[in-house]
Amino acid sequence: MPAAEASPLYQLIEAVPDVETYCRLRAESGLSPKTEEAARRGLAGTLFAVQVCCGGETVGMGRVIGDGGCFYQVVDIAVLPAHQGLGLGKRIMAAISGYIEREAPTSAYISLIADGDAKHLYAQFGFKPTAPRSEGMALFKRAAQQP
């Protein structure tokens, strides 16, 4: 398959995915699953989102969340396994970087959490580890009990 940058098969659209698409992409791309309720609430707070479509199907996505002034966080960078390795993650990040360049004030703090080797992709867009000056931390709520 040709590189996604040169392929007319892939279209990049600036749009927030619907709840079903969002949950499917997260689960199928290996990100932690989210409930529909969590997705509905979270997607409403999106500052910027991009989707990659192929043949009418959304095969990749990325979002920016935050307060729109001081803090921006890059989240949900996901590409379905069958479409990985084609430069789609790079296209998603290029669109997100363009948004941040246009919209974020110079004093804004832009962050993300890099899973595994994704750190190499993010480094191409200027992201650097914050350690040892700072260290990312998280609080995990227990997943809702399934019936």
Regions from the PLM with identified roles:
Residues 2-37:
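Short amphipathic alpha-helix that is part of the acyltransferase structural core
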Residues 41-51, 106-108:
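A short helix-loop-beta-strand connector motif used in the catalytic cores of GNAT acetyltransferases and
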Residues 47-62:
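Conserved beta-hairpin
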Residues 70-81, 137:
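Conserved acetyl-CoA binding element of GNAT-fold acetyltransferases
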Residues 83, 87-95:
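Conserved acetyl-CoA pyrophosphate-binding loop and the N-cap/start of the following alpha-helix
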Residues 93, 100-114:
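Conserved GNAT acetyl-CoA-binding A-motif
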Residues 107, 111-113, 123, 128-146:
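Conserved catalytic-core motifs of GNAT/GCN5-like acyltransferases
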